[in-house]
Amino acid sequence: MGTKMIIHTVSDGETLKIIAEKYGTSEERLREHNEIEGESLSVGEQLLILIPTRTYYPKPRDSAESVMARFGMCEREFYGNNPGVRDSRLPKDLAIRYTPHPYGAAATNGYFYKGTSPERFADTLLHLTYVTFASSALCDSGIKELFDTSEEIKIAKRAGVVPIVKIFDKRSDRSVKKINIDSIVDHAKKCGYGGISLDLAYTGSEPSEIAEFLVELRRAMIGNDLILIGEMSGGSEELCDYCDGCVLPICEGENLGEFTSRVKDYAERSESIKTFVEMPVFGKAGEAFIPIKEARDRARRGKYRLDSDKSSGFLSYDHKRVGKISFPSLEYIKAALATVNEYGFMGISFDINGFPGQFLNIYYSLFKTLKSITRTYSELYNRGS
């Protein structure tokens, strides 16, 4: 038995204190796991309760660092679970509480867009294998940096996270024949990246031309210790064979049944072990999309009562100004992550700034994050064993 994961639905009259006492946890842990800043909770809101249930009695030579390494814990998790530990030295006869990961190892690919907050970046690094900076573009005049990432690259490397550069294509003629492969590789190496991410759809190019381009690009990258991540779009799945990894994009607004069916269908016809499944970051506000965190926080501030649609996996409420707002529930994300595990995907991909901390905490309670540029395929294939 590992961590007890409970998804609690808030009832009328419940407060953080009441809920914390009910599950034998603290208000501080509830706030941290659910990104709660004020006192307001929405009736019908789902809260994540994580309670470590295993203990380990340290040996004489054990330190906090060695125990963290042994059980795959980050500092925040270790010290949060064990308030009696103040530094690297472990008190005598203290039982260390830890969290096993029932789904085993997986990789994560977090996207860093312009405007991502430093605090959010620092918090998310604990859970990342790769960080993809959406920071460069192919233009008619060459490669252009959209924003500076030099400091963030250093921070990522210190945390053992591989930095990757996402290169947009903003040329007037998007044929792959006119791409200078050496310039792409030189740009990645000069800036300190460990890999390159490209959209696999190139307007005006035949699939055979794109495949030939990817073969030549990958050959140049391997000689420079770089990896290639392909971002799929319509009709480009077969091109993933030419990449080290690829991203199966989210269809924002799809219900849980549609998500599960799409992921299963992909796994049955493609190589899931080298594929990241993108996680949702948007809900719906009327006919428009709205970030899930904003949808949830609006409900808290306005003290709206949330309705749960178990068939779709969405929570919803009627906002006074914008009408119906709906967004994926914690149950949706838990089930989506179970699907990722069941069909043997490499891991998940998500927008660092937009992916709710609640969702990330569910992921981290289920998977151990790989921290290496060289994927440990044996660890992935034996996931959960």
Question: Where do the model's predicted regions map?
Answer:
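Primarily a LysM-type cell-wall glycan-binding module
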Residues: 1-23, 45-72
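Glycan-recognition patch characteristic of GH18 chitinases/ENGases
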Residues: 98-183, 375-376, 380
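Hydrophobic faces of well-ordered beta-strands that scaffold small-molecule active sites
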Residues: 108-112, 131-133, 163-167, 196-198, ...
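Short, acidic/polar
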Residues: 112-127, 175-190, 233-239, 328-341
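Active-site groove signature of glycoside hydrolases
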Residues: 132-135, 181-209, 234-237, 245-250, ...
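Substrate-binding surface in catalytic domains of secreted glycosidases
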Residues: 140-147, 203-303
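Active-site-adjacent "subsite" loops/lids of carbohydrate-active enzymes
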Residues: 170-191, 247, 310-320, 324
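Glycan-binding loop/region signatures in secreted carbohydrate-active enzymes
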Residues: 273-276, 281-336, 364-384
